[in-house]
Amino acid sequence: MYRVTILVLFLLVALTWGTTWLAMRIAAETIPPMFATGMRFMFAAPCLIFIAWLRKTPLLFPPGQRLFQVVICVFYFSIPFSLMIYGETYVSSGLASIIFASMPVAILIASLFFLNEKTNLMQITGLIISISSLAGILLEEMKINTGGHWQGVIALVSALIIHAIIYTQCKKRSSTVSVITFNALPCFFAGLILSAAGWYFERPQISVFSAQSIFSTLYLGVFAGVFGILCYFALQQRASAFQASLVFLVFPLIAVSLEKYIYGYAISTHSILLVIPLVIGIFLSIFFK
């Protein structure tokens, strides 16, 4: 039963993360990126705050860490998530998911710089393989799809780097706050900031918002932003770090398959072949910790 629970949680997280990228693409079809991200967080925040109230979980970080809570709001939620959906206005959801599948590698690199963590030959080999493969995929896709493609890639890679740095800073500070505390208030204030900024700078026309885009932001907020977070946290508690990290190897396959099925678009054959060494590189980086 224990193994079944781990498998179910793993599949739920993989499906949630895999569908998130397609949902962001649909949301950005009629809603400006910044405003859509603000809507996403405003849908998620009340649910997270309600869960905190039910569990009697504090909303504020412990004294001495509350300035870092502001950092989380800006550099974990506001900027990276806006960059993600902005990036998807230029690149496919499948390619975006492949970029973010490299998160374990980005975290390893950030840990080397900010935490002075020791590494080994296999991890370094994995880093070289994965970075080279990802670079090959990006160059191949940018060669095929010119005109603004590079803007999306830069936005997504920037979001990846920022998330990796914030992760290492959380680890460095030995933050012991609960997953609800970590997400609730930063998510709420990020939603307010992005909704206000999006309304002022992007001038969204509510009359052109499609039902699909609105539903996608609701899905991103409530399902991916709340249910997905809780499932991944539960998976981390029950599974080994290695087992939980395998999600990063699975969710891009779901994202690419969904995009192919719904939009009929797929990354090039060369890029698909380069995914194989990318997965091997990520696997080596995770497994030989």
Residue ranges and their predicted role:
Residues 2-6, 30-34, 38, 61-67, ...:
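Juxtamembrane helix-entry segments on the extracytoplasmic side of multipass membrane proteins
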Residues 15-46, 92, 165-189, 203, ...:
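Juxtamembrane helix-loop-helix junctions in multi-pass membrane proteins
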Residues 16, 20-21, 49-100, 136, ...:
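Specific transmembrane alpha-helical segments of multi-pass solute transporters/efflux pumps
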Residues 37-39, 95-102, 168-191, 221-261:
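Helix-helix packing/entry segments at the starts of transmembrane helices
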Residues 48, 110, 119-141, 194, ...:
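Hydrophobic transmembrane alpha-helices of multi-pass small-molecule transport proteins
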Residues 48, 107-109, 113, 144-202, ...:
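Transmembrane alpha-helical segments that form core, pore/gating elements
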Residues 49-56, 103-128, 252-273:
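C-terminal transmembrane-helix exit sites in multi-pass transporters
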Residues 64-72, 119-131, 153, 177-186:
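Cytoplasmic-side transmembrane-helix entry/capping segments in multi-pass membrane proteins
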